[in-house]
């Protein structure tokens, strides 16, 4: 069974693929099967993924409000996916905010550039402070 961290890695990968116009239902199901994401974890994955897509405009607006030098369009695709996942979880789930931000930082360390963890931490921390 996949861990929550592995589920989040998969969501970031799916969001990244969607940005590259490679999203379709068959791809999503095959991807989740390949990653052995089943049952409750599959539901958790799809709930987060679909929720992010449903709230994409709001998430991008919130993220843009927290960016100093550039807007989301100038952010690398993988970092954008991590930010969207983190922002969605902060705004729409009951998961502890410290866990959400820590997970996003870990995803950035694993999947993004050297400066990404600090950048993602800063943006998500601002979003978190706004909703408290």
UniProtKB/Swiss-Prot annotation:
A Gene Ontology BP annotation from the UniProt entry: transcription antitermination
Identification of the protein by name: Transcription antitermination protein NusB
Source organism, top-level taxon: Bacteria
Function: Involved in transcription antitermination. Required for transcription of ribosomal RNA (rRNA) genes. Binds specifically to the boxA antiterminator sequence of the ribosomal RNA (rrn) operons.
Organism of origin: Campylobacter lari (strain RM2100 / D67 / ATCC BAA-1060)
Lineage: Bacteria, Pseudomonadati, Campylobacterota, Epsilonproteobacteria, Campylobacterales
SUPFAM superfamilies associated with the record: NusB-like
Cellular component annotations (GO), alphabetically ordered: cytosol
Family the UniProt entry places it in: Belongs to the NusB family.
GO molecular function, one term: RNA binding
Keywords tagged on the record: RNA-binding, Transcription, Transcription antitermination, Transcription regulation
Disulphide linkage map: none
UniProt xrefs under InterPro entries: NusB-like_sf (IPR035926), NusB_fam (IPR011605), NusB_RsmB_TIM44 (IPR006027)
